[in-house]
Every structure is written in structure tokens, then in C-alpha cells.
From Swiss-Prot:
Protein name: UDP-N-acetylmuramoylalanine--D-glutamate ligase
The protein's Enzyme Commission number: 6.3.2.9
Source species of the chain: Clostridium kluyveri (strain ATCC 8527 / DSM 555 / NBRC 12016 / NCIMB 10680 / K1)
Enzyme class: ligase
Keywords linked to the UniProt accession: ATP-binding, Cell cycle, Cell division, Cell shape, Cell wall biogenesis/degradation, Cytoplasm, Ligase, Nucleotide-binding, Peptidoglycan synthesis
HAMAP family: MurD (MF_00639)
Domain of life: Bacteria
Length: 458
């Protein structure tokens, strides 16, 4: 049930608020809370030097700063605490604060609660950003004033008073954001579910339960969009509280989105031909079908077709960088899981030179070896997981007698140079790490941009 934002303004006024994490979304949140008359303290593990100019700005606004390794030692005596998404609600500091009466929430939870416009929420292990961006563009093409946020775009809560009931909002939601949510968007999309983020979640069951929160609190008039081809998402149909619309690239559906030979269809109507779309790979066909299903009630076929046949993708997602001496280089830095890397590999017509490896999210790489070996010509490994991935391919060789040449590298520069040395005219080199970036880079964007710099400097 949507609430009037005036209620929040009354609720927040003169309250003592703690904001944990001074990041991309929380800086605008702090400014917004101050504007509404709250007393704000900001907490972050970083030192004043690491935060830099932002720390000085916040102090000038009379925000109390608690910084450094012991920043969570005292969260007591706060009325409300806004936490950063990746922090677990069951951490001792939050448990203690809750016991003392604090209301613990997040920027995105409060946005969904008070946003007056229809919200389309998108989650999944892979394909979230592309699907979210497609939906945003289709809605804009239809003529709606549209907003995009959550894991991508700009923080939205500070803009909530600018949004009207006639607008449309598309948000990308991670499992971290969903873990503590007790409110769901009117339209919920789950692109797929496979093992991911098991470095943060206790186990796969907790990860799946977090994803389910996107529809757990829907009403009977709301919509849930699910991937029929994914075993885990298909099994969720019986748990839906509202309407369900599915999509499939494997079978024709009476209702929903599907691939019929070379046509992308929704509810029996052709949207466009497979040959007309610019996005590479069948995983992107799934993303398009998911977007069609989510928007079927609000847009026409023409708007879907226009975006489907002109949208060329989001940066760092199977992004063509350059061709050098007949070798094509692609940046797929977003691929932070084995399943996402597999989807990228399947977009190419022949085996590629794959650069992989990075931060260990505690997920297995057996699936990458067993389902990806036929798409890999040479494997160049780097980062914290390079030996773990190497072991998966060595096990494959023992089991199936399939040998994939493996090169070990100590940096991205070394990995790219190694890939170049073994490449020949007609080859494809792709950075598709199957891992997060945090062992070597602050985020996947920096990793992808460095890859592009290295390639463009060759």
C-alpha cells in the first residue's frame, strides 16, 4: 500500500538518523534528510582522507561523521538507521540498534513505499541492467515521463516529490537490496536465478529467498514476470500473489513472451524478427522478452519494436572495443558469475580467447568448464580465483578428456598481452571474468574501462 510522502516528512522531522555508508546513493539521501529537518550522523569504514571532499562538505552541513575501522561500535540512540544494501541486517551492530528501538531501513525500501508512480522492479542473477534499461527506453518511447534507478541510474528517493502518479519508474534490485524488503513493486521481473553472491549470503536458499521478496508482498492485481526456461524461476509460479506472465526462448506460449522460429512475440503478436535486433546473444533475447512481458499492459507493439531494433546495449556488456590485425576485442566486464560468462560466450559463433578470473564469491566454476569448454579456444586466467577456475577445467579434462589451453596471468595488462600473443586473424578476445572485480578493481566499470584502455593503446 503506497503512503503519502507528507507522512514521511512528519515522521522524519527532528528525528535522530544514522546513515551507514557514504556512497553513491547515500550522499543525496543525507542531503535530502537534512532538507527535511532531520538530525543526521553518517558512518563509514573509510578514513577522512579516503572520503576526501565529501567529508568536508558533510561537516559544513553539521553532519556528525563516524569514520574508520570501528565506525559501527556505537549505533545506539538513533530513531532511524538507513543501511547500505550490502550490509547484513543480522550484523551485531544492527541487532543491538534494533533492540534499542531503532527503525532500520534503506533508501530503496522507503522509495518504493512512498513513490506515487507505478514501479517496475527487475531482479535476477544475470540480465538485470539490460532488462531494466530496455524497459526504461520502451516506456520513454511510449511517451511516459520515466525514471530509472536502484542499482543503476541516480538515487531516486531524493527525487520522490518530483514524481507524479502518471510517471513510470523502473528499478534494478539486487539480492542485497531485497533481503530486508517488506514491500514489493506493482510489476516484478525475475530474469533468472543461479548461484551468486554466496560470499555474502549464508547459502543458496537465503539468496533465493531474497529474490522472492520482489513479489512476496504484491497484491492480487500486481504482475510477476518469470523465466519459464529457468528451473528456479519457473518453480515460483505457484507462489505468486497476483498475475503471472512468463517468457521462453525454448517453447511457444499461449500467453507471454516467446521466440517463434525467428520472431520475438508477445501474446501471439510478433514484435520483431531475430535478425532485426542489435543485441548479441540469446540471453539478450530473453532480456527483450522479459521487458515485453513486463510492459505489455502499458505500451504498444510499435514502442517495443522501435527499441528492440535500435537498442545496441549497455556499456561493459558484450561491448565491442576494437579490431586489431583481424582480432576483435570485446568488453564483457559485467559478467561476474559463471552463468553470465556462459551467456556471453554463446553470443559468439566460434570459440574465443577468454580472459577470466577475479574476486571469489564462493561459487563453483564447474558449470563454466562443463558447459563452456566448446566455446573457448584458449583460457587466460587472472585474479584471486585463477587457480580455482584452472582446477575446474583440469577436472573436466580428467572426466571428459577435453583439453583447453590455459595461460596464467598476474594482472589485467599481462592477461590482455598474453591473449594478443596467442591470437590470430579471425579470433575474438573477450574479457568475461565470471567473477566480481573487488580483488583488483573497485568495481566492474573500472575493470572494463581499464581493459578498453589497454586494448586501445595496443
Amino acid at each position: 500500500m503506497k503512503r503519502n510522502f507528507d507522512d514521511f516528512k512528519q515522521f522524519i522531522k527532528c528525528k535522530k538518523i544514522g546513515v551507514v555508508g557514504i556512497g553513491i546513493s547515500n550522499k543525496p539521501l543525507i542531503d535530502f534528510l537534512l532538507k527535511l529537518g532531520a538530525r543526521v550522523s553518517a558512518f563509514d569504514k573509510k578514513s577522512p582522507d579516503e572520503i576526501g571532499e565529501v567529508a568536508r562538505e558533510l561537516k559544513e552541513k553539521n553532519v556528525d561523521l563516524v569514520l574508520g575501522e570501528k565506525y559501527l561500535n556505537d549505533l545506539s540512540d538513533f530513531d532511524i538507521i538507513f543501511k547500505t544494501p550490502s550490509m547484513r541486517i543480522d550484523s551485531p551492530a544492527f541487532v543491538k540498534a534494533k533492540e534499542k528501538g531503532a527503525y532500520i531501513t534503506s533508501e530503496m525500501e522507503e522509495f518504493i513505499r512512498y513513490c506515487p508512480a507505478k514501479i517496475y522492479g527487475v531482479t535476477g542473477s544475470d540480465g538485470k541492467t539490460t532488462t531494466t534499461t530496455l524497459m526504461y527506453n520502451i516506456l520513454k518511447k511510449q511517451g511516459y515521463k520515466s525514471w530509472i534507478g536502484g542499482n543503476i541510474g541516480t538515487p531516486l528517493f531524493s527525487e520522490v516529490e518530483e514524481i507524479t502518479p502518471d510517471d513510470r519508474v523502473v528499478i534494478e534490485l539486487s539480492s542485497f537490496q531485497l533481503m530486508t524488503m517488506n514491500i514489493s513493486p506493482e510489476v516484478a521481473v525475475i530474469t533468472n536465478v543461479s548461484p551468486n553472491h554466496l560470499d555474502i549470503h549464508k547459502d543458496m536458499e537465503e539468496y533465493i529467498m531474497a529474490k522472492k521478496n520482489i513479489f512476496k508482498y504484491q497484491s492480487n492485481s500486481d504482475l510477476l514476470v518469470l523465466n519459464k526456461d529457468n528451473e528456479l524461476t519457473n518453480s515460483m509460479t505457484g507462489e505468486a500473489l497476483g498475475k503471472v506472465r512468463q517468457f521462453s526462448i525454448k517453447e511457444k506460449l499461449n500467453k507471454g513472451g516467446y521466440l517463434n522460429k525467428d520472431s520475438l512475440c508477445i501474446d501471439g503478436d510478433e514484435v520483431c524478427k531475430l535478425s532485426e535486433i542489435k543485441l548479441k546473444g540469446m540471453h539478450n533475447v530473453e532480456n527483450l522478452l522479459a521487458a515485453f512481458c513486463a510492459l505489455k499492459d502499458d505500451v504498444n507493439i510499435e514502442s517495443m519494436r522501435e527499441i528492440a531494433t535500435t537498442f545496441s546495449g549497455v556499456e561493459h556488456r558484450c561491448e565491442f572495443v576494437r579490431e586489431i590485425n583481424g582480432v576483435k576485442y570485446y568488453n564483457d566486464s559485467i559478467a561476474s558469475s559463471p552463468t553470465r560468462t556462459l551467456a556471453g560466450l554463446k553470443a559468439f559463433e566460434k570459440p574465443v580467447i577468454l580472459i577470466a578470473g577475479g574476486y571469489d564469491k564462493k561459487i563453483p566454476f564447474d558449470i563454466l568448464a562443463e558447459e563452456g569448454y566448446s566455446k573457448i579456444k584458449t583460457l587466460v586466467l587472472m585474479g584471486a580465483t585463477k587457480y580455482k577456475i584452472k582446477e575446474a577445467f583440469e577436472n573436466l579434462e580428467l572426466k571428459k578428456h577435453v583439453h583447453i589451453p590455459i595461460i596464467m596471468a598476474n594482472s589485467l595488462v599481462e592477461a590482455v598481452n598474453s591473449a594478443r600473443k596467442v591470437s590470430c586473424r579471425g579470433d575474438v578476445v573477450t574479457l568475461s571474468p565470471a567473477c566480481a572485480s573487488f580483488d583488483m578493481f573497485a568495481n566492474f566499470e573500472i575493470r572494463g574501462n581499464m581493459f578498453k584502455e589497454i586494448v586501445n593503446d595496443m
